[in-house]
UniProtKB/Swiss-Prot annotation:
Glycerol transport is regulated by pH, with the porin being permeable to glycerol at pH 7.4 but not at pH 5.5. Water permeability, however, is not influenced by pH. The modification Phosphoserine is found at residue 20. The record marks 135 as: Important for permeability to glycerol. It holds the Pfam family MIP. InterPro entries: Aquaporin-like, MIP, MIP/Aquaporin. One of its GO terms (molecular function) is glycerol channel activity. Aquaporins contain two tandem repeats each containing three membrane-spanning domains and a pore-forming loop with the signature motif Asn-Pro/Ala-Ala/Ser (NPA). A motif (NPA 1) lies at residues 94-96. It comes from Macaca fascicularis (Crab-eating macaque). A motif (NPA 2) lies at residues 226-228. The lineage of its organism: Eukaryota, Metazoa, Chordata, Craniata, Vertebrata. This is Aquaporin-7. Belongs to the MIP/aquaporin (TC 1.A.8) family.
Length: 342
């Protein structure tokens, strides 16, 4: 009897500890920053698995893969990634897109390392996944050697490399320009004051955008247009046995897909804001459409109850006795446009 009672108390105590741990984990996972980190991690992982898998098919067996297949793999991989995390973090899946949104005031800088870390980890894990799934095919194709260049090179499955007909700085210009086109079109797709994609179709339209960039402009450099797509898999290949040549090949090409997209995304965003965003007519602010500018977009405020709010001429936020002290100044022009996220 005594032993049975002790056993029951021990079991009850273990369950209480388990519930407490689970509750703590659940509490942590519900934190906004953690959810956004996990969203970027998962969406980038999904995009990269489909994208790198399509490249593996093209490199390892022409019967099953093609350049068009690579574009479709990355394009619809982006679509699936947006579906996975679009309403949580915006599903950037691209450090250049995150950087541009931070630089243009759409996302606070404190989120930049969180988003990028999630993207890098997701991309690295996707590279490890493709390596595991295609391991025997890679060895069979290359004769057991992990080569960066040559007719049996397989490092290109995971990262981009400069082709013979391109110079380093032409490649830099190419990557910057393509990423600028990407960011400009992303702003257009999500600008509700212009001709945005229909609700529910943004993910598909963004995926089609990636396909269009690939089939029309991707030949020169393989269109990395994304540090999160190129650098983590490159680091994985270095660890997995391809060696330091993954960094030195192509006049030390590795840094170009990291730096050029950052500059290009900002340039594309600025061009859209100056030439399109600033010239688009904006409807006068209505009381029922009052908005508060938050960290990651524009949030519609609910109507007040019995207290009649007023609109301050200096701020778009509804002003009432309950919230007058928390009013913030009106944002600059570029923040007044609904540009959204990737």
């Amino acid at each position: 009897m005594v032993q049975t009672s002790r056993h029951r108390r021990s079991t009850r105590g273990s369950k209480m500890v388990s519930w407490s741990v689970m509750a703590k984990i659940q509490e942590i996972l519900q934190k906004k920053m953690v959810r956004e980190f996990l969203a970027e991690f998962m969406s980038t992982y999904v995009m990269m698995v489909f994208g790198l898998g399509s490249v593996a098919h093209m490199v390892l067996n022409k019967k099953y893969g093609s350049y068009l297949g690579v574009n479709l793999g990355f394009g619809f991989g982006v679509t699936m990634g947006v579906h996975v995390a679009g309403h949580i973090s915006g599903a950037h899946m691209n450090a250049a897109v995150t950087f541009a949104n931070c630089a243009l005031g759409r996302v606070p800088w404190r989120k930049f390392p969180v988003y990028v870390l999630g993207q890098f980890l997701g991309s690295f894990l996707a590279a490890a996944t493709i390596y595991t799934l295609f391991y025997t095919a890679i060895l069979h194709f290359s004769g057991g050697q992990l080569m960066v260049t040559g007719p049996v090179a397989t490092a290109g499955i995971f990262a981009t490399y400069l082709p013979d007909h391109m110079t380093l700085w032409r490649g830099f210009l190419n990557e910057a320009w393509l990423t600028g086109m990407l960011q400009l079109c992303l702003f257009a797709i999500t600008d509700q004051e212009n001709n945005a994609a229909l609700p529910g179709t943004q993910a598909l339209v963004i995926g089609i955008l990636v396909v269009i960039i690939g089939v029309s402009l991707g030949m020169n450099t393989g269109y990395a247009i994304n540090p999160s797509r190129d650098l983590p898999p490159r680091v994985f290949t270095f660890i997995a046995g391809w060696g330091k040549e993954v960094f030195s090949e192509g006049e030390n090409w590795w840094w170009v897909p990291v730096v050029a997209p950052l500059l290009g995304a900002c340039l594309g965003g600025i061009i859209y804001l100056v030439f399109i965003g600033s010239t688009t007519p904006r409807e006068p602010l209505k009381l029922e459409d009052s908005v508060a500018y938050e960290d990651h977009g524009i949030t519609v405020l609910p109507k007040m109850g019995s207290h009649e709010p007023t609109i301050s001429p200096l701020t778009p936020v509804s002003v009432s006795p309950a919230n007058r002290s928390s009013v913030r100044p009106a944002p600059p022009l570029h923040e007044s446009m609904a540009l959204g996220h990737f």
